[in-house]
Amino acid sequence: MAEIEVWRGSVAAWECDAMGHLNVGFYVARAMEALAGLAAELGMAGAFAPEAHATLIVREQYIRFLRESRVNAPLSMTAGVLAMDETEARLVFAMRHADGALAACFQTVVVHATSREARAFPWSDRARARAEALAAAIPAGGEPRSIALAPLATQASRERADALGLAHTGRGVVLAEHCDRFGRLRTEGCMQRLSSAIPHVFAQVGRPGGEADRGKVGGAALEYRLIHHAWPRAGDRLELRSGFGGGDARFGIVVSAECHKAHLAERRLAGSVRPEHADLGTGE
């Protein structure tokens, strides 16, 4: 892929989960910083500034996790453009350790839109020219493994979740400090809420976690696909519903939906889980 570095940093202790690994929400936070860097390379250096008239809105994000990142791990990210149409683009971000090993790979679909109304409009000729220069391929090992990226027609709703018997795994309200400059819940905030719900998912299958289970059973995300259908704003109440969508003794797929302002996510987990069935979406 194009070796355009768009982010460099390290892992702080407070960003790690109970297993000592960088929490998935902070992977996404890094990817959003990297998106700002790539936006600058496309000629949109101020895309996320308060006064911006045009911005990039994440519509979909696929993440493949390949190697854990622990406290003080030095990391960097490169980025490029996989495809661009009239108003959208599919971008690729590769997060690497200092030794060059791939830590995670992101495919992010963004919409070129007005910052306040989120109305899509065509890319500029300058951005298209830069996109051609930044054309990239998915790095080896970063390809999707178990989650298809075909178009998805969501059925996510509170009624659908009730019909499937999905567990209540999160409730809350969007706070102003969790929103971006344009008043929308930040992308990493969606992932952080999904991550926070996972202990409740395991509790449903008899593994409540906590101090008593420390060191016994753990889980690690292998893949995510998140599709954003609407963006909650400050004051909006959220409800998260989750369930197992399939798997075996070692792997499971957790399907979650944030109701009211629906989001859809598939998460493939490594761990000891009991698979059940849930279906919130159908491929087209």
Indicate residue ranges for each PLM-predicted region.
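Short alpha-helix capping/helix-loop boundary micro-motifs
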Residues: 61-64, 223-227
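HotDog/MaoC-like acyl-thioester-processing domains
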Residues: 3-7, 64-74, 78-153, 230-237, ...
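Hot-dog-fold acyl-thioester-processing enzymes
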Residues: 1-59, 111-223, 281-284
